[in-house]
Curated annotation (Swiss-Prot):
The lineage of its organism: Eukaryota, Fungi, Dikarya, Basidiomycota, Agaricomycotina. Binds 1 Mn(2+) ion per subunit. It comes from Agaricus bisporus (White button mushroom). The keyword Manganese applies. This is Superoxide dismutase [Mn], mitochondrial. PROSITE patterns: SOD_MN. One of its GO terms (cellular component) is mitochondrial matrix. Its main location: mitochondrion. It catalyses: 2 superoxide + 2 H(+) = H2O2 + O2.
């Protein structure tokens, strides 16, 4: 399977003022693109049984870059311009679940932001569905580790490349801002698929 950098479904400046054009361009064109290229290169080397190059274990590097690519591909779909679907939680199954589990969107944001801001170093904040009881849960993963115990509904990149140029080291400001461009339509589609096994 080829690793392909996904096109963004919006312009680089479409998430302003919450995420700057500069961040989006660098994050997508450089960081996300590099993950794809590295994963592809490692895959080619491993196909030819070159597992270690210059002291680096390419099988591990392949896994790390592939996981980063998967997380970022989900992240890009997670976002939408505030002038469109961004930040708009409409009535429906996801809103009902958020109300039932967290007592409303504001409470979800507060709990999610507190949990995610607590990550030491780089990682991801997640809202996911527990497959055993179909309930929403908040979780975090370090580095580019995937969300294994939950089905991802919303993922937020908390690596510095996602926010530092605009928010410096104030993670809380970035986390508060990103909710204005969360694509809740996509989140609801994922939620319905995770809980009912059907697609909207």
């Amino acid at each position: 399977m080829a690793h392909v950098l996904p096109d963004l479904p919006y312009a680089y400046d479409a998430l302003e003022p919450y995420i700057s054009r500069q961040i989006m361009e660098l994050h997508h064109k450089k960081t996300s693109s590099d993950l794809c290229e590295c994963a592809q290169h490692c895959r080619g080397c491993l196909r030819h049984s070159t597992a270690v190059v210059g002291g680096f274990d390419l099988s591990l590097f392949f896994i790390l870059t592939t996981l980063g690519h998967i997380n970022h591909s989900l992240f890009w779909q997670n976002l939408a311009p505030a002038a469109g679907a961004g930040g708009q939680l409409k009535p429906g199954p996801l809103k009902d679940a958020i109300d039932q589990t967290f007592g409303g969107l504001d409470n979800l944001k507060k709990e999610f932001n507190t949990t995610t801001a607590g990550i030491q170093g780089s990682g991801w904040g997640w809202l996911g569905v527990n497959p055993s009881n179909k309930r929403l849960e908040i979780s975090t993963t370090p580095n580019q580790d995937p969300l294994l115990n939950l089905v991802p509904i919303i993922g937020v990149d908390i690596w510095e490349h996602a926010f530092y140029l605009q928010y410096l080291n104030v993670k809380a400001d970035y986390l508060n801002a990103i909710w204005s461009v969360i694509n809740f339509d996509e989140a609801q589609r994922r939620y319905v698929e995770a809980t009912q096994g059907s697609k909207l």
